[in-house]
């Protein structure tokens, strides 16, 4: 029997104290979801447990099942709401999550990853994945390797867990557009369908971040690209026994919260309505082959890993050199410091700086290097297996 799915995803921008109009926006989001026909909701950046509990209580009548993925220091910020029962839940935390000393970015403290809720609807199983990849922040993008390996880890996780499901949905803020390496990895490896390419009625252009219609968008970014960047996505993968028709796809929210002069979030929402139905004729189950295009994508990913490891080795040398020089200075000036509180504070600061450089060049370097090696060897193993398989079939 055919069935409908109506999925909704939104990066809520829910940083306590920092995010503007947070309380009013959560109230508006809850009101919209109460009145909507969405059956599955994936939210990101719900950083406060209090906000999650508010949403949970507000949506208990139409979306009675929910799960928040606790992780890291602040929590992952990810939660899923469902009309139907959640049979299983699991969270996979990524080994690379930014840098602890980049406090103003905060990704490391969130302990980000990908959450899975396996939803049971009658005798059907629906895998719902919710995720939020590392942000870019700057054009030089020092987090490219982190985000790329997060994408690969997510793609492999989806690829290895979709088996029992009739349909699998990946929703969230990927911080990557259709042409980006991370997006290619996520869509080509499992593989996943981008409904934007399937919906003939879709509006063009269609952005979800830094859009002219969003009150929180950076005016400088809007001038460069008024339609914004499409970095929030809903992607899906079907069991071979099923097919799906895209009924509706786009941003379901108005530009402003009704009666207010601000938007629901600094990102636009995305919704997808699917009609899922069994294939009319008997199907021959076959293995879904990963296209040759992913070979090029994997090669690019390996190159990014290699460059990141080279840069990391250079950083190690810099950190240890600076840390060593500071340590020599501290040892060499023992007994020469005046007995004063001010100088004691200065010594304490310099000592802390010394420890920072030495730890970054030793412990943190090993953690990041091993994470990069893990991703690199996995990608190399994938490419090697693909080559050997092609040789065997020729």
Can you annotate each of these PLM segments?
Residues 1-9, 17, 22-26, 30-31, ...:
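N-terminal signal-anchor transmembrane helix
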Residues 2-4, 12, 21-22, 34, ...:
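Structured beta-strand-rich core segments of catalytic domains in phosphoester-bond hydrolases
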Residues 6-12, 25, 29-55, 81, ...:
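Active-site beta-strand/loop signature of hydrolases that rely on acidic residues for catalysis
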Residues 10-20, 139-147:
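Glycine-rich phosphate-binding "P-loop"
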Residues 14-16, 72, 176:
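Short histidine/acidic/glycine/proline-rich micro-motifs that form metal-
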Residues 20-22, 93-94, 141-143, 182-184, ...:
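Short coil/turn segments at secondary-structure boundaries
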Residues 25-26, 57-61, 97-98, 145-146, ...:
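Glycine-rich, phosphate-binding/catalytic loops in enzymes
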Residues 159-169, 175-394:
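Metal-dependent phosphoester-hydrolase catalytic domains
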């Amino acid at each position: 029997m055919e069935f409908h799915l109506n999925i909704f995803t939104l990066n809520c921008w829910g940083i306590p104290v920092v995010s503007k109009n947070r309380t009013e926006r959560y109230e508006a989001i809850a009101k919209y979801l109460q009145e909507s026909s969405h059956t599955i909701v994936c939210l990101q950046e719900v950083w406060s447990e209090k906000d999650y509990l508010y949403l949970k209580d507000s949506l208990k009548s139409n979306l009675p099942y929910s799960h928040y993925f606790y992780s890291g220091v602040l929590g992952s910020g990810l939660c899923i709401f469902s009309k139907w029962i959640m049979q299983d839940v699991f969270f996979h935390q990524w080994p690379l999550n930014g840098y602890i000393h980049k406090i103003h970015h905060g990704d490391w403290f969130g302990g980000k990853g990908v959450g899975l809720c396996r939803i049971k609807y009658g005798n059907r199983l629906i895998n719902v994945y919710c995720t939020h990849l590392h942000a870019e922040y700057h054009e030089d993008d020092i987090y490219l390797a982190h985000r790329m390996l997060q994408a690969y880890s997510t793609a492999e996780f989806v690829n290895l867990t979709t088996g029992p499901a009739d349909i699998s949905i990946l929703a969230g803020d990927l911080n990557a557009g259709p042409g980006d390496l991370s997006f290619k990895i996520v869509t080509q490896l499992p593989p996943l369908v981008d409904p934007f390419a399937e919906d003939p009625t879709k509006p063009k252009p269609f952005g979800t971040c830094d859009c002219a219609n969003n009150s929180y968008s950076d005016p400088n970014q809007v001038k460069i690209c008024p339609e914004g960047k499409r970095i929030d996505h809903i992607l899906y993968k079907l069991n071979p026994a099923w097919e799906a028709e895209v009924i509706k796809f786009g941003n379901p929210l108005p530009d402003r919260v009704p009666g207010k002069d601000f938007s629901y979030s600094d990102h636009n929402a995305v919704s997808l309505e699917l009609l899922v139905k069994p294939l009319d004729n008997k199907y021959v189950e076959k293995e879904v082959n990963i296209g040759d295009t992913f070979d090029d994508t994997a090669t690019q990913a390996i190159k990014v890993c290699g460059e990141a490891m080279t840069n990391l080795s250079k950083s190690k040398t810099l950190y240890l050199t600076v840390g060593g020089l500071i340590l020599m200075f501290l040892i060499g000036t023992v007994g020469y410091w005046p007995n004063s509180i001010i100088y004691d504070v200065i010594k304490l600061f310099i000592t802390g700086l010394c420890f920072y450089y030495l730890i970054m060049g030793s412990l943190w370097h090993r953690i990041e290097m091993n994470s990069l090696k893990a991703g690199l060897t996995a990608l190399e193993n994938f490419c090697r297996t693909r080559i050997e398989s092609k040789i065997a079939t020729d």
